[in-house]
Amino acid sequence: MRVILLGPPGAGKGTQAKLISEKFSIPHISTGDIFRANIKEKTPLGIEAKRYIDNGQLVPDEVTIGIVKDRLTKDDCDNGFLLDGFPRTVAQAEALDEFLKGINKELDVALLIKVPEEFILERMTGRRVCTSCGASYHIRFNPPKIEGKCDICDNELIQRKDDTEATVKERLEVYSKQTYPLINYYKDNGIISEVNGTESIDEVFGNISNILGRDK
């Protein structure tokens, strides 16, 4: 089972990726994680990627693709994988498809978790985190007993900079520009499947399991 996970920030991809990985016994490959691993291990590609990151530049496709290719050749990917955070562009998708075709491991499913923008805004801008113990809350879905105070240690709750409305809208705009062409690419290839990400975690995972069960 070879799967790509698509969806906007705040769609719950991380939660679903963990559940998919456990149920279908395939590694969850996050591009952020493999970048950090390569940089930490000082691999040639990691050193090159760090040079761009340290200079505040985007890591070029050839470096990103090289790091992903290297990860996909590991033994734990023999029976499949779940890619999260890659590809981000059609050019990356084409390079990935060419590589996978060459090793006889073409993609089975591009899984899109769909969530309306207003739902994401409410979900992300309502998040609060404790400045001391790191406990997470949501002003609507999981509020603290006392407004602005952590239930566990009574310290102040704050909104992270990443969760302000302006930042969330900016991230959603970047996602739209990057990902809509990618969604159309996988639609044209006939492998995209969509799930409604506004339902509960269990309901979303149930729908995903049905889709992946069909494609096994």
Swiss-Prot record:
One Gene Ontology molecular-function label: zinc ion binding
Segments of this protein annotated with the region NMP: 30-59
Sequence positions that bind ATP: G10, A11, G12, K13, G14, T15, R127, S136, Y137, E199
Signal peptide, first to last residue: none
SUPFAM superfamilies: P-loop containing nucleoside triphosphate hydrolases
Binding site for Zn(2+): C130, C133, C150, C153
Recorded catalytic activity of this chain's protein: AMP + ATP = 2 ADP
GO biological process: AMP salvage
Keywords: ATP-binding, Cytoplasm, Kinase, Metal-binding, Nucleotide biosynthesis, Nucleotide-binding, Transferase, Zinc
Binding site for AMP: T31, R36, Q57, L58, V59, G85, F86, P87, R88, Q92, R160, R171
GO cellular component terms, semicolon-separated: cytoplasm
LID: annotated span: 126-163
Subcellular location: Cytoplasm
Pathway involvement of the protein, from the record: Purine metabolism; AMP biosynthesis via salvage pathway; AMP from ADP: step 1/1
Oligomeric and partner information: Monomer.
Domain notes: Consists of three domains, a large central CORE domain and two small peripheral domains, NMPbind and LID, which undergo movements during catalysis. The LID domain closes over the site of phosphoryl transfer upon ATP binding. Assembling and dissambling the active center during each catalytic cycle provides an effective means to prevent ATP hydrolysis. Some bacteria have evolved a zinc-coordinating structure that stabilizes the LID domain.
Function of the molecule: Catalyzes the reversible transfer of the terminal phosphate group between ATP and AMP. Plays an important role in cellular energy homeostasis and in adenine nucleotide metabolism.
Name of protein: Adenylate kinase
Organism (species): Clostridium botulinum (strain 657 / Type Ba4)
Gene transcribed to yield this protein: adk
